[in-house]
Amino acid sequence: MTVKIRVSNTLSIAVLLLIASTSFAQTSSATNRAASRSWPAFWREFSAAIQKKNVAALTKMMPDDFFDGGGGLKAKEWLQFINENEKKGSWRDIQRSVARGTVASKKYSKDFPTRVTKDNAYYFEFRKDKRWYFAGVVGD
């Protein structure tokens, strides 16, 4: 009887560990490959939208949970703020940041592939729907 209980307990622990490891698993290699393949097209489209100050196109590239750096603005509100502050250089600053390019980053998210501008100002995430998003402003 004791052997059956030990075997049962061992199997239960193994199953729980397997479930836990898949629940907390990092990004899969297939996801990373898909992200790498789709990044250049997204980046070209995003960079063009930034250069043209195309708010409609940018809005489509931003998730509902866009992070504005801590001010609590939604994506459309943040873009409106950028437009309203154009004379203070808001668009110019974003354009310069984007012109420098991006690097892959694991600092901000282990759940999905992430890239950040080289000046560490803005970040991008490849979400579960297999699309890249301009996910937010890097907070202080």
How would you label these PLM feature ranges?
Residues 12-18:
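Hydrophobic helical h-region of N-terminal Sec-dependent signal peptides
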Residues 28-48, 59-140:
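C-terminal-biased regions
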Residues 51-52:
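Charged, alpha-helical scaffolding/interaction elements associated with membrane systems
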Residues 20-22:
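N-terminal signal peptide c-region/cleavage motif recognized by signal peptidases
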Residues 2-12:
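Bacterial N-terminal signal peptides that target proteins for export
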